[in-house]
Amino acid sequence: MTSARDWIRSRCPEALAAFEQAGAQTLADYAAGFGADAALPRPPQAADDLVELAAATCARLYSPDLGQALRRELESDLHALTANHHGVDFHPEFFQGDLLFAMSCRHAVPLFNCGAVPANNVAYPRGILLGCGTPEEVSFRSRKLPILPGRDRHGLISVRPAFTAAEVILPSQLSGQPEEPHALDRLVQAVYRHPRVLEQQTFRDQASPMNALLWQQVIPKSCDLPPLVSLDMQWLCGRLITADLEQPDSLVRHLLLHPPLAAAIWDALNGQRACWTGDAQGLQRGTFLFWGVDGKGRALALRPACDFRSLVAVRDAGWRLPLDARTLGRALTEERILPSLFLYFATVTAARGLRCAGGIFQTSYLPRMIRGICTALRHCGADGPATRIAGAFRPCPPCTGLLPLRLPCPDGPLRQTGRGAGAADLWLAGGLSPALWQSLRHSRVDHALAASLPYH
């Protein structure tokens, strides 16, 4: 555990400091820090369009009533959990992060998830994750039950086609599996083959109700938790950017269409986590502003041209994207580009003031993104917007990464302390009970951190 603590301290000192400082707090008290601070100055742009878009999308994918619940949540507290990959949250870190964030919510639990990740990412969106082995063996080990075909697994979630009922594989049909996959057939039927899921036209839209259905399966109404709303952040952000390109004073329009500002952004954040690393010879890591999407739905890393008036694909010399409003709007509509993580936070947090709860890495990189944007604006003489952005932002304590919910570990030596539970593990154990939920709410942060360290 000491080495794990040192690992977090070396890579995410802000996250570990936040956990340690809040050690004596209950998780419920700690979660209060995920809420927006109404006393802060207003950001450069109002968030009305973000709230309206999220509520309308929720009404379309879930129900009009849930759309109104999400609207009430965001209007009373402009916050969202942004740590997860878009899919079904079987992963222990994502599922338990959802539970912790839910402690800060009243009407709905807003998840704005990253869809610009391939289908074979760590969250395993094409199947179920079950706990396996012990945390000491590796940082996180799980057994994967493939529910959907493996084709297109390198394609991005945001542009992945919808699956059909015939493509859903029941766990009992998989060879060489122990007994519990047969019990999981009921969970798969309730989540993957639900009519609301199968009527959606894209995997992106299927993942939203699937996550809510899993939430309902694992968490009974008696626990009195708000409903879960899971939306693709890249899709939401793309719609906002398209509108911002038509607004002369919007931050994103200036960032995308003003080459000196784009160049200053490149310099300010070059080499930072979740941004990009590159030089005149090329791009070594990340992408600049957008991800390109190739003909197979896979990601293309983009670098700026020398004049910062276009973006060029690193792996495809013939792929070029002029940075003008008409071309960008069309490319977003046709899903030939997806907003990067940086551009997402520039659009919703820097410009509109959305408070984003995230994981241990976001605790470090989001404040650096905000500082980088402000540095670039001041470099270009835009001191006023930089001051407003800096004044409206306060770092959010880390959310995803604590694993307070433990279940027995029959296949390893952790029978006393248990193993971090994912959604399927908890479902197999009978689901969340009101008593367990209250116990979680009153657990201490330092105890949850100690239980989580073997997984890092």
Short names for language-model regions:
Residues 1-86, 160-165:
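N-terminal regions that are enriched for targeting/export leaders
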Residues 8, 173-320, 328-334, 339, ...:
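Aromatic-residue-lined binding/catalytic grooves and analogous aromatic/hydrophobic interfacial grooves
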Residues 67-79, 188-189, 332-347:
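Active-site-adjacent bridging/hinge elements
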Residues 78-87, 194-201, 347-357:
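Glycine- and acidic
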Residues 91-108:
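Histidine-anchored nucleotide/phosphate-binding helix
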Residues 113-211:
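Internal, well-ordered alpha/beta segment that forms a basic, Gly-enriched binding/recognition surface
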Residues 363-377:
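Short active-site loop/helix that positions an aromatic residue
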Residues 379-411:
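Charge-dense polyanion-binding interfaces
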